[in-house]
Amino acid sequence: MVTQDLLNAAKIRVRKTSSNVLDEDIKQLAEVAIRDLERIGVAGIYLSACTDPLIREAVLTYVNANFGANPDRDKLMSAYDMLLIKIKGGGYRA
């Protein structure tokens, strides 16, 4: 679930301070990242509020990589993939 706190953090990550229709795009990207974490077996307790620093960073990195036409998308997706590897080995399963 994308909380308001997570949405605000994602907006800051993509350097967006105003609220408008693009907030829905950011929220959708965060939801995709959360579902991807769920897909690799992360327990729901870690995904309900995304307060764990590693989980939160993965979501924010995914949003940053995929929002708009980020010229650093490939580097950011590599960073996201590395975070997934760390999460897989970090005891985040139920």
Predicted regions and their residues:
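Divalent metal-cofactor coordination and adjacent catalytic microenvironments
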Residues: 1-94
